[in-house]
């Protein structure tokens, strides 16, 4: 439960801002002899006392200059005498203009339904993802684009606040590289299915034009991957190079030489730095992270995404009263909500999300259930991202959770549409309140 409303949470750097902290319950109200101190995390100045006052309704109003781009702690000390006091720490983040103009959106763009090798209906997955606090999602079934379109069409008028986009995982013939088509206007899988001869002819042309070829190397995989990247890009999608260090029993699924060439030629749009690996496969994500930073040291910077690659949102335990699964009470499955992307964008639309991922305005989040969150991207985005995971997204999720539950009930045949419609705009309103300049 959130004891206080604090707005705004994000403010412009190097400007005077007004922060309003309102206790939501009587037991959280400010009492005793109150004092207020502000501490910039980067120690750009010593701890100081800002201008502040308490309003009649108990709201604490703090006015201060928040320097540079960093987190700030507003400490409220209540002295009750006889050595008794209570301290509450509140945190905000000041941002330079370019990042202050963008909003954080949580999404997953690589997951599967029962239409390929997943377990659940794509419409149900959308409801579960909203329940988990996601702003956007794309279903990317193996070899099939149409299931994602069906999910988009089903929910678009019922819950327009949750942004659903088309997608697919592309498996071009004789190419082991897996590639996600996020947001493309049509299916790339259908292109090679409808005319495989044309696909092979165009791949051969790419091979012919590759420079400095060596005898005996697998240029088909490189060229076939670039054929897919180009088809996705031509149709407005984001071409994602997926899990290069996924390994099976006999070794890595894609050869290291192919990984080298694909990264060196850098024709894809985004790199899956964090993919859907189970705890016992931790080495794969570790290798992908190290490889990313090694490529950066060579002057090659890839936009990054984190994805769950989940094949189901629900798992079931065993009922102690009988032998078998308790199939009426599920819990979150492994991978679901473990790995995802935070995109800093002007709005949660496909052009804005794709455009900002390409500009490297994104973070990959690695946060398996019960474990610490690790973020990957630029230093600037990572430290802002940690603040958001702690101070922003939990409250957003509380609104999304209600929507997601109502979506599930609607899908199950219950008349929850009026209740769902009554919540429309709540998450957008919360997001803007977190950035809105407060008046004294």
What would you call each of these model-derived segments?
Residues 250:
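Inter-heme linker and motif-flanking segments adjacent to c-type heme-binding CXXCH motifs
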């Amino acid at each position: 439960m959130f004891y206080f409303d604090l707005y705004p949470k994000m403010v412009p750097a190097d400007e005077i801002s007004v922060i309003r902290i309102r206790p939501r319950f009587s037991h959280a109200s400010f009492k005793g002899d109150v004092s207020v101190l502000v501490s910039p995390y980067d120690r750009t100045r010593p701890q100081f006392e800002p201008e502040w006052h308490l309003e009649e309704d108990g709201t604490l109003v703090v006015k201060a200059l928040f320097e540079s781009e960093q987190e700030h702690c507003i400490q409220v000390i209540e002295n009750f005498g006889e050595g008794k006091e209570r301290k509450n720490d509140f945190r905000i983040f000041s941002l330079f203009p370019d990042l202050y103009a963008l909003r954080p959106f949580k999404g997953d763009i690589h997951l599967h339904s029962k239409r390929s090798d997943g377990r659940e209906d794509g419409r149900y997955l959308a409801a579960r993802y909203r329940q988990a606090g996601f702003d956007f999602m794309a279903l990317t079934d193996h070899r099939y684009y149409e299931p994602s379109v069906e999910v988009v069409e089903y929910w678009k008028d019922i819950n327009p606040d949750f942004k659903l986009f088309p997608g697919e995982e592309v498996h071009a013939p004789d190419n082991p590289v897996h590639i996600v088509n996020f947001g493309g206007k049509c299916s790339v899988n259908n292109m090679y299915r409808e005319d495989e001869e044309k696909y092979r002819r165009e791949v051969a042309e790419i091979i012919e034009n590759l420079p400095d070829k060596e005898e005996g190397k697998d240029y088909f995989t490189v060229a076939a991957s670039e054929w897919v990247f180009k088809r996705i890009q031509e149709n407005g999608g984001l071409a994602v190079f997926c899990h290069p260090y996924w390994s099976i029993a006999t070794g890595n699924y894609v050869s290291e030489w192919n990984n080298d060439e694909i990264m060196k030629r850098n024709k894809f749009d985004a790199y899956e730095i964090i993919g859907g690996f189970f705890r016992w496969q931790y080495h794969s994500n570790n290798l992908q992270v190290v490889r990313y930073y090694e490529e950066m040291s060579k002057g090659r910077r890839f936009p990054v995404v984190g994805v769950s690659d989940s094949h189901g949102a629900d798992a079931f335990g065993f009922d102690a009263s009988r032998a078998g699964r308790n199939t009426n009470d599920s819990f979150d499955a492994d991978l679901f909500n473990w790995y995802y992307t935070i995109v800093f964008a002007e709005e949660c639309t496909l052009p804005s999300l794709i455009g900002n991922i390409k500009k490297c305005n994104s973070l990959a989040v690695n946060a398996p259930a019960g474990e610490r969150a690790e973020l990957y991207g630029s230093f600037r985005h990572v430290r802002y991202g940690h603040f958001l995971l702690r101070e922003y997204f939990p409250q957003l999720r509380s609104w999304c959770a209600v929507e997601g539950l109502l979506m599930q009930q609607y899908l199950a045949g219950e008349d929850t549409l009026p209740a769902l419609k009554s919540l429309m705009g709540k998450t957008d309103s919360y997001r803007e309140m977190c950035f809105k300049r407060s008046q004294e």
